[in-house]
Amino acid sequence: MDFDYSDIVVTVKLDEKTFKRFARFDMFSRRKKWIRPALFSLILIVFAFIALLARKEQSGVIAAVLLVVGIGLPLVYVGTFLSQVNMQAARANLKPDQPVYTVPLRDEGVRIVNDRKEEEPQEVSWDSIHRAYRKNGCIYLYVTPSKAFLLPSKQADAPDHEVWDFIRKRLGEGKCKG
């Protein structure tokens, strides 16, 4: 039985796993930041094989250096990113039972209330919301291209599919993925 909700309230309690999953999604799936390191790696590997085909005196050394740099730098890039995400998650002190923010979804827009510190609530109309994604049991609500709020499953006062339907109905199919 489906209900037509006029307001849905999501009291968000984030854990480290959800935060890290979002960071990986944002970096690699949404912003596609894996393409340049992969392209760099591919180019250097091709040059390494070309150097080996030259059969000159130092071509083996040049090929080895190109392979080490071509594989090593992208690995360092990804490793540094994952390390920074781990440090951010630890610094944020995310505990599954602590509310981080509350997001009432209303017909006129979204209101974000910070539950960790005293600050003015943020009001965002549906027209100005950039995009919404539904991935891995969580809705990523991007209020701008660089700022998202996470709405994990089973934390709203409505079933998860109703929350997603509510958002899709107000944003439109073009702004919703998942």
Label for each model-derived stretch:
Residues G137-G178:
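A membrane-cytosol interface segment of integral membrane proteins
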Residues Y77-E123:
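Conserved beta-hairpin
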Residues D15, V110-R111, Q122-G137:
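Phosphoinositide-dependent membrane-docking surfaces
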Residues M1-L42:
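N-terminal membrane-targeting/pre-transmembrane regions
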Residues P104-D107, R134, V143:
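Generic beta-strand structural signal
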Residues R30-K95:
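Alpha-helical transmembrane spans
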Residues T102-V103, D127-H130, K154:
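Hydrophobic/aromatic beta-strand elements that line small-molecule binding cavities or substrate pockets
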